[in-house]
Amino acid sequence: VWNHETGEYNKAQMSDKRVQVIDYGVKKSFLNELVELGFEVEVVPASTKSDDIINNFKAGKIGGVVLSSGAGNPNILTDEIAEIKRLIDSNIPILAVGLGHYLLALASGVKVDKIKSIKYGSHPIRGEKTVEICGINGDFKISEDIKNIADVTHIKVFNDSAVALKYKNKNELSSEFSPVSNSSICQEFAQMVK
């Protein structure tokens, strides 16, 4: 949780679950959600090499990685996409949100297109057992081809478009929105992280 006195994040107490968050423009509130989930969180710059993260994973220093939200066109972030491909190949548990959601899809070989008619704001999102209101601010949409490699776990109620995914045969989850700590997405990611 953010500590206003020190200007830093407090580490989760007695946490044996550590994750690195790749910062593409991460929100403090989302980092707080990860800490509330019981993770010790280390934020690393977007320029961090996948080999460093993979070595930390193999050494047992971290149990997973989070690809954060942020601004910009995911299609032009070719260096980041190449690094994420290596993370995918390492089988490290990945949670991707916002911009990270699109980058993970691109790294998995699926096309991401700009939406012609953008609708920002609060949207009802239907999961397996719940309907939640979430803030959607994405200008992009993942191709329907994603269904060949991922299961859709959450959709927008208004238009049935996919907004959260679980990749098949992988330890990878992603969502267009920032999930809260008690959401099924975060709970499943917590189970993946050792």
Predicted regions and their residues:
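RNA-binding accessory domains that recognize and position tRNA/RNA substrates
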Residues: 1-61, 74, 180-194
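Residues that mark the start of a beta-strand
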Residues: 18-20, 40, 93, 133, ...
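Cysteine-nucleophile active-site neighborhood
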Residues: 56-57, 62-131, 169, 180-192
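Conserved hydrophobic/aromatic beta-strand scaffold that supports enzyme active sites
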Residues: 122-124, 164, 174
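Catalytic beta-strand/loop cores that center a nucleophilic Ser/Cys/Thr
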Residues: 129-170
